[in-house]
UniProtKB/Swiss-Prot annotation:
Protein name (database record): Sodium/myo-inositol cotransporter 2
NCBIfam families: sss
Alphabetical list of Gene3D superfamilies matching this protein: Sodium/glucose cotransporter
Keyword flag Lyase: no
Gene giving rise to this polypeptide: Slc5a11
Reaction(s) this enzyme catalyzes, per UniProt: myo-inositol(out) + 2 Na(+)(out) = myo-inositol(in) + 2 Na(+)(in); 1D-chiro-inositol(out) + 2 Na(+)(out) = 1D-chiro-inositol(in) + 2 Na(+)(in); D-glucose(out) + 2 Na(+)(out) = D-glucose(in) + 2 Na(+)(in); D-xylose(out) + 2 Na(+)(out) = D-xylose(in) + 2 Na(+)(in)
InterPro entries: Na/Glc_symporter_sf, Na/solute_symporter
GO molecular function: myo-inositol transmembrane transporter activity; symporter activity
GO cellular component: apical plasma membrane; plasma membrane
Entry superkingdom: Eukaryota
A GO BP entry: sodium ion transport
Pfam families per the UniProt record, alphabetical: SSF
Length: 673
């Protein structure tokens, strides 16, 4: 075992490439192909069994998901390929402090189910911009948020996941980057378009199992290679590149590498920023981001939504052990590549002069694992990439259809909404492919830190508007919009400054302005949150009070108010889509305004599949869930009051589990603090 602790020398070749002519064996290819067959089979199965010909069936999986696929989908949507690459890379570079994001997310996902979700369910909303529209009135806040969400999805989430996945695909398979990405995006878009949210959730559940199995196997190989946790602690601080300058501090491991809480002024992640500045973006992601909330809204009732959040919370403990520690092991085993400190050497190793820590996880996969298991881990990375992309595609399509297209065409038929939602997925695929060169040109030394810094500039104002809307009844539209715009403008200024004044390399002087150099992005998150809060409170206090309709069942304190009863609609009134606890259709008075039109009354809406259609057309219509060939009379809509009540025994079990989960997180915080 002693020999396993000795760092291997760089490969003897003309280049210091991190992946010297590694290729997939036939067994690896077989495992990868088997994975794709499983994914397509699950996607097809969920496509066939799910009602996809209604807006609710397509975008909210019919509202009848049980807790375990919801929890698996929450975890898989969060842990994409960017997590595997980014967390392991940051672990190799600076130690375990980056795991604070995962432990912080554990609390936030529980907040979603126990605090925010009851408000969303009581208000019967399907998208987050819609909640703001109903809570504050008007359209400018919801439209601003819809555009901002699409911007974040396209230019940060999709680009980051594609770059991270490309590191694996391009280097391990030696495929052309564009060919590999186009193939993945095509398969991903196919079952997203065909099956809607149900297909996404079921494939996420499958991919969560694959990810966990593969990650546990690699963790075992990693710890075995360094002699366990004690061996890692002893050897990490000795993991230095052989070609680094003795007179430079560049490339040295941090002395506080095994601590989460670090110096408030000089560290990479100051502890006040972790406790406060990190929590606000975390609340935005887990409690107001469409990708996450949409999965919880698909649960059949509040208890199943809580169970899903609990499952995801328990799984959030794992990234520290499955990703961060293996990243640190990779530095120990391959210091000349993973811990390279000279820009020219790093350029030769990974084509990135800023550093090569992001190759830590792929390096372990390709160097430690035997044939077959290497293919399994390749499937894990593909699973992580595809699960994230499917989540983003479906949620972005929902926002565009529900909040933007429905605003442009308020009387659009349900069939039109379904077609627009599917076409938008393909538009996202096209934009994603065109964005690949930008991703390649803007890669950073630590991918995960890049993601979090961008989040800290754009997400706090949105989070504060949601928090104030949910917990202060006096918050009105003018206050929320003023705080949102001011916060976003300040965040965009800091974001632009970060791009203009890029962080210098370790061997270069830091001449950036003080606001960029001396104000950590987590501290800026705190400043941004406080500024938005003061603006919202001040403007709301000196302007009109919100009407009762904008408060009833839309805040924490009014969530149990009875649903306002309206006069019965005439028989010819079109039915409207609603979200309920049990998947039933709600009355128009409490629904979001997505009107359906009887398809038999107009050719514009179509008659389903008529005998005149060819087999090709019928196949396409079946794929898109529009294959009905006869009109089904709409069922009579009865007023239904959405209940937040739970079975007392189930509620007690969930609450006890929540306390246990929080206790585990607090223990880990204290142990590694």
């Amino acid at each position: 075992m002693e020999s396993a602790t000795i760092s291997p020398q760089p490969p003897q070749s003309d280049s210091l490439e991190a992946f010297p002519q590694k290729s997939m064996e036939p067994a690896d290819i077989a495992v990868l192909v088997l994975y794709f067959l499983f994914v397509l089979a699950v996607g097809l199965w969920s496509t066939v069994r799910t009602k996809r010909d209604t807006v609710k069936g397509y975008f909210l999986a019919g509202g009848d998901m049980v807790w375990w696929p919801v929890g698996a989908s929450l975890f898989a949507s969060n842990v994409g390929s960017g997590h595997f690459i980014g967390l392991a890379g940051s672990g190799a570079a600076v130690g375990i402090s980056v795991a604070a994001y995962e432990l912080n997310g554990l609390f936030s996902v529980l907040m979603l189910a126990w605090v925010f979700l009851p408000i969303y369910i009581a208000g019967q909303v399907t998208t987050m911009p819609e909640y703001l529209r109903r809570r504050f009135g008007g359209n400018r806040i919801s439209i601003t948020l819809a555009v901002l969400y699409l911007f974040i999805y396209i230019f940060t989430k999709i680009s980051v996941d594609m770059y991270a996945g490309a590191i694996f695909i391009q280097q391990s398979l030696h495929l052309d980057l564009y060919l590999a990405i186009v193939g993945l995006l095509a398969i991903t878009a196919l079952y997203t378009v065909a099956g809607g949210l149900a297909a996404v959730i079921y494939t996420d559940a499958l991919q969560t199992v694959i990810m966990l199995i593969g990650a546990f196997i690699l963790m075992g190989y990693s710890f075995a290679a360094v002699g366990g946790m004690e061996g890692l602690k002893d050897q990490y601080f000795l993991a230095l590149a052989s070609n680094r300058s003795e007179n430079s501090s560049c490339g040295l491991p941090r002395e506080d590498a095994f601590h989460i809480f670090r110096d408030p002024l000089t560290s990479d992640l100051p502890w006040p920023g972790i406790l406060f500045g990190m929590s606000i973006p975390s609340l935005w992601y887990w409690c107001t981001d469409q990708v996450i909330v949409q999965r919880s809204l698909a649960a059949k009732n509040l208890s199943h939504a809580k169970g899903g959040s609990l499952m995801a919370a328990y799984l959030k403990v794992l990234p520290l052990f499955l990703m961060v520690f293996p990243g640190m092991v990779s530095r120990v085993l391959f210091p000349d590549q993973v811990a390279c400190a000279h820009p020219d050497i790093c350029q030769r190793v990974c084509s990135n002069p800023s550093g090569c820590s992001d190759i830590a996880y792929p390096k372990l996969v390709l160097e430690l694992l035997p044939t077959g298991l290497r293919g399994l881990m390749m499937a894990v990375m593909v699973a992580a990439l595809m699960s994230s992309l499917t989540s983003i595609f479906n949620s972005a399509s929902t926002i565009f259809t529900m909040d933007l297209w429905n605003h442009i065409r308020p009387r659009a038929s349900e069939r039109e909404l379904m077609i627009v939602g599917r076409i938008f997925v393909f538009a996202l695929v096209l934009v994603s492919i065109l964005w690949i060169p930008i991703v390649q040109a803007s890669q950073g030394g630590q991918l995960f830190i890049y993601i979090q810094s961008i989040s800290s500039y754009l997400q706090p104002p949105v989070a504060m508007v949601f928090i104030m809307g949910c917990f202060w009844k006096r918050t009105n539209e003018k206050g929320a919009f003023s705080g949102l715009i001011l916060g976003l403008l300040l965040g965009l200024v800091r974001l632009i400054l970060d791009f203009v004044y890029a962080q210098p390399r370790c061997d270069q002087p830091d001449d950036r302005p003080a606001v960029v150099k001396d104000v950590h992005y987590l501290y800026f998150s705190m400043i941004l949150s406080f500024t938005t809060l003061i603006t919202v409170v001040t403007v709301s206090w000196f302007t009109e009070t919100p009407s009762k309709e904008m408060v009833s069942r839309l805040t924490w304190f009014t969530r149990h108010e009875p649903v306002a009863q309206k006069d019965s609609a005439p028989p010819e009134t079109p039915l409207s889509l609603t979200l309920s606890q049990n998947g039933t259709t709600e009355a128009p008075g409490t629904s979001i305004q997505l009107e359906t039109v009887q398809e038999s009354t107009t050719k514009a809406c179509g008659d389903g599949v008529s005998p005149r259609h060819s087999k090709v057309v019928r196949a396409i219509l079946w794929l898109c869930g529009m294959e009905k060939n006869k009109e089904e009379p709409p069922s009579k809509a009865e007023p239904v009051i959405v209940s937040l009540e739970e079975n007392p025994l189930v509620k007690t079990l969930l609450d006890v589990n929540c306390i246990v989960c929080i206790s585990c997180a607090i223990f880990l915080w204290g142990y590694f603090a």
